[in-house]
Amino acid sequence: MKVSRRDFIKQTAIAATASVAGIPLGTEAANFVTDSEVTKLKWSKAPCRFCGTGCGVTVAVRDNKVVATQGDPQCEVNKGLNCVKGYFLSKIMYGQDRLTKPLLRMKNGKYDKNGEFAPVTWDQAFDEMERQFKRVLKEKGPTAVGMFGSGQWTVWEGYAASKLYKAGFRSNNIDPNARHCMASAVQGFMRTFGMDEPMGCYDDFEAADAFVLWGSNMAEMHPILWTRITDRRLSHPKTRVAVLSTFTHRSFDLADIPIIFTPQTDLAMLNYIANYIIQNNKVNKDFVNKHTVFKEGVTEIGYGLRPDHPLQKAAKNAANPGDSKPITFDDFAKFVSKYDADYVSKLSGVPKDKLRQLAELYADPNVKVMSLWTMGFNQHTRGSWVNNMVYNVHLLTGKIATPGNSPFSLTGQPSACGTAREVGTFSHRLPADMVVTNPKHREEAERIWKLPPGTIVEKPGYHAVLQNRMLRDGKLNAYWVQVNNNMQAAANIMEEALPGYRNPANFIVVSDAYPTVTALSADLILPSAMWVEKEGAYGNAERRTQFWHQLVDAPGDARSDLWQLMEFSKRFKVEEVWPAELVAKKPEYKGKTLFDVLYRNGQVDKFPIKEVSTEYHNAEAQAFGFYVQKGLFEEYASFGRGHGHDLAPFDRYHEERGLRWPVVNGKETRWRYREGSDPYVKAGTGFQFYGNPDGKAVIFALPYEPPPESPDKEYPFWLATGRVLEHWHSGSMTRRVPELYRAFPNAVVFMHPEDAKAMGLRRGVEVEVVSRRGRMRSRVETRGRDAPPRGLVFVPWFDASQLINKVTLDATCPISLQTDYKKCAVKIVKV
């Protein structure tokens, strides 16, 4: 087969990308089809399975197997590029230990909590699962059942799960693993703008004059977006890049303003910037007067620890951490005035000239600024605050909702936005930014879902961290985990996670494609379909919703999470899960199953199977007899249409490479809240932050407060955890790709060479990382891509053989309830 010049150049670029990760690209590994069988390949579009960037790929299938993938040149997000993980997508589904049958712990032919895993049929698996869930519901009621889901759920999987729990079981104890990554971003948006998700889009990369990275290593975690920043920086010499972190990483290679700061002091630096803007008369007074109001948040809000923890007992406002009161601009100016260069430099360890350079980027009215952040902001005991505070500096200067002026929260999972946030799979949320605590929102959800009034419970359910605590305490007893690996991902796993899974009173179900740490801790493992083994939809960080068709069948008896949810719902009649007075309000539901009420309700089942594309298989449509995905999507979309969350009709997404909502009259929206761009902004207003009743954004006065745990004589190091380029999250997919595994096979303890020398350690020496909660064994690394300052160590968490979350602290932001994985105190002990 001839290779065109374009393909040759593209493959050279692939090889260069791979070489950065130290990956040899042999004939097999190159993922580039060059044989004569190429004409037998069927290529189709799909979004990448990994991060929240939402890159488009084209997928080649032959003989019911994915054999190649490549970047989709028609996708606006990545324009044909992929990162090194994306180039190996074709291999993630074919690990040697792929789960293909349900596995139940058994002894002497029966379920036993202490038994060994044995293969069973789906009927046997659901029989035991049904027995356990009904037992718990009968004995303790709906507050004792729960689910932990995912920002990797497809849109309809998350929607079906939310309906099953919030409407079917009448339990709000459903939360996604996006609680660990995006909850603070959600609260930041909701508190400031009254609506979730960014007002800008990826087009801002080509329009900005300055980029400020707050706690984000985009070079490794969002490499395709990083190429757009790099292109802008190198092609427009006046462009500036500031990178702020607690340790040096690859993104610093492009930094004009590199800043290493003491953990937690980003709060103080943001107040310094606000103060600098005010003191130097750089406030955009017209914008501020027309479009903002000021509030002061309560302080001393605690750290989301157990109620008997001394820090929680001392927290005066732990019960209402999100409260605030109105203030004036003058009050705000006085509040931030103490955050001058001298104070903040001493607190943060950042030289005053660096602080000034940073502040000048925001203050200069002629510089368009894009602020970008991920886990450094969000995984923070004041994560909601720090999100609010970055909006403060954009609002004070009016640098918002216009091309190149964009405070932009980057997303870590492929559908943390599209599913966890937009669908509302959090324990307190409903679709389209509605919440269970609002009676009007509950009423609207009950109307759309055809439920009797009072079905949806007002009280929010257990969030992610609280779920583990309630499992341990025996208050949450029937528990289903889908598309996540929380026994590796949760903080303080030995004290707060594992005990709950092994609690004899609890029955734990894990749906996964591989035998993860979490799956092996469960009582029942259900084999799940992956990625293009099912029809799906994701929503990325720029509000872009993307669809794909099922391209291959799942192996063996593996089934999609959607099928599992819907099939399991057939096991429950409404009388078994709803009180008699609720059933009496809808007597026609008596004797019906939850499947009938939730999924065969005249809406979800309204689209016949003949509407499924004849070019593709659809396992769920075949199983249930109607176009399941279309019915679920259209019912879900009805929540947001006409309310600023408009989605296009289902079929259009299969034709497009994604659309950014709100989609009104067939047109997507690039910049929200701006007249002329957002159809919801009234003419003559200029800007309208219509998520809030007054149409104004909130500027919050919030202080610096210390972290719950800092280094001391016994535990002298800060610990930060995170990711690396080659692996994604817990590594359950990427570590099964041989090339990615070889590139970075095991986690290490990155530390400063002088710290290692002072302790008599050298590179490669085996050590233990020890905290007040646990210990983990690894090896020292004093070279390479990550360079911590003295007094801090960085450990990636992708390695199932090195569970760094044995060590971390399960403290959270009390407002968002998101865990802080970036700072706790540890010591390093030579083995």
Swiss-Prot record:
One of its GO terms (biological process) is cellular respiration. Mo-bis(molybdopterin guanine dinucleotide) binds at residues 85, 152, 177, 181, 214-221, 245-249, 264-266, 375, 379, 485, 511-512, 534, 561, 721-730, 805, 822. Its cofactor is [4Fe-4S] cluster; Mo-bis(molybdopterin guanine dinucleotide). One of its GO terms (molecular function) is molybdenum ion binding. It is found in: Periplasm. SUPFAM superfamilies: ADC-like, Formate dehydrogenase/DMSO reductase, domains 1-3. It is an enzyme of class 1 (oxidoreductase). [4Fe-4S] cluster binds at C48, C51, C55, C83. SMART domains: Molybdop_Fe4S4. One of its GO terms (cellular component) is membrane. InterPro entries: Asp_de-COase-like_dom_sf, CT_Nitrate-R-NapA-like, MoPterin_dinucl-bd_dom, Mopterin_OxRdtase, Mopterin_OxRdtase_4Fe-4S_dom, MopterinOxRdtase_cofactor_BS, Periplasm_NO3_reductase_lsu, Prok_molybdopt-oxidoreductase. Residues 1-29 form the signal peptide. Its main location: periplasm. Substrate binds at W797. It comes from the Bacteria. It catalyses: 2 Fe(II)-[cytochrome] + nitrate + 2 H(+) = 2 Fe(III)-[cytochrome] + nitrite + H2O. Binds 1 [4Fe-4S] cluster. Binds 1 molybdenum-bis(molybdopterin guanine dinucleotide) (Mo-bis-MGD) cofactor per subunit. It holds the Pfam family Molybdopterin. Catalytic subunit of the periplasmic nitrate reductase complex NapAB. Receives electrons from NapB and catalyzes the reduction of nitrate to nitrite. Component of the periplasmic nitrate reductase NapAB complex composed of NapA and NapB. Belongs to the prokaryotic molybdopterin-containing oxidoreductase family. NasA/NapA/NarB subfamily. This is Periplasmic nitrate reductase. It comes from Cupriavidus pinatubonensis (strain JMP 134 / LMG 1197) (Cupriavidus necator (strain JMP 134)). The gene is napA.
